[in-house]
Amino acid sequence: MPLRSEEGPYFGDFGGRFVPESLVAALDELSAAWEAAKADPAFHVQLDELHRSYTGRPSIVTEVPRFAEHGGGARLLLKREDLNHTGSHKINNVLGQAILTKRIGKTRVIAETGAGQHGVAIATAAALFGLSCTIYMGEVDTERQALNVARMRLLGAEVVAVKTGSRTLKDAINDAMRDWVTNVETTNYIFGTVAGPHPFPTMVRDLQRIIGEEAREQVLALTGRLPDAVAACVGGGSNAMGIFHAFLDDENVRLVGFEAGGEGADTPRHAATITKGRPGVLHGARSLLLQDEDGQTIESHSISAGLDYPGVGPEHAWLAAIGRAEYRPVSDAEAMEALRLLSRTEGIIPAIESAHALAGALDLGRELGPEGVVLVSLSGRGDKDMETAGRYFGLIEEGAVQS
């Protein structure tokens, strides 16, 4: 059976639905609405038109030869999801789920966010569709992504800083799930990645598939052939599944996900879930998790808020298990150096999340040599990361006014 035809709820041993009884009806309703929407031409017409006139799709592919000189001379092609409205791939998923929210008659949306890109996309869609909106964000992330907090609030969303646990993405998801249980009659949870209980992994992947479908045609037109490798950063894994999916059945195309190696995958401070994780259940699905000897989820670390998550989408865990995709850690330092290098060689400032894929792509380029072609998901732009990058590289003078 073609790998692209996998629909869940299970991907091999991973996936499923492990949730409180109070959420089963809401998930069933969402699953039924999603199946009905997929079969309804009007849904696709509405979503396609929004992508054309609002998101700005199709996103372009940019070749980056000066950057590629640092990676063995292979051709590096960037799929520019950073140019989408709201600055990342997140809008692809959010618009589809916002339409679904209206179709099932809910008036309020909630979401989790790490880097704030999903939150900004949700707040944007809520404004567009006239929905009430609450965003849960770990307190640590509200501090390192203050610009996106301001954006969400300007767009009319309530932003709740989560002060429990590690105060990052995992804890934001926990609180959003609690809200959904309490307010399920009026509220739809717009999950941001390919994790969580069924139908989220499949639905989010399907809404992000447009990345790879566009890129496949664009690379063929540009190079006359498929790429040797496709690279993407992996936290929960939605941008990666979005670009990988179109190539799943092309056996000669390597699919490589780059996880947050933090201070090193052999230290306690990383978020390299596939590299170092073991099977377990988190946020309603069975996948690979970072956990201690007692099976308790342990804190992850990444300089990137969007990759700072101790789990991963179940389809990624499955692709790793069957050997179709490979996953490697990229350290904070490697990602930040790639961010600076792309900025200085090509005039494109990537998100720190995306910079993990860029660092990995340089390694792939060296492995493939000058004849190689690597397609990279540039999942977001770096505006939100200027304070982090400014501190990291010493670019902001002490006491300088920041605007």
Curated annotation (Swiss-Prot):
Keyword match Amino-acid biosynthesis: yes
Keywords noted in UniProt: Amino-acid biosynthesis, Aromatic amino acid biosynthesis, Lyase, Pyridoxal phosphate, Tryptophan biosynthesis
Catalysed transformations (reactions): (1S,2R)-1-C-(indol-3-yl)glycerol 3-phosphate + L-serine = D-glyceraldehyde 3-phosphate + L-tryptophan + H2O
Coiled-coil regions listed: none
Entry's EC annotation: 4.2.1.20
Modified residues (N6-(pyridoxal phosphate)lysine): K90
Lineage top rank: taxon: Bacteria
Protein name stated in the entry: Tryptophan synthase beta chain
Source species: Leifsonia xyli subsp. xyli (strain CTCB07)
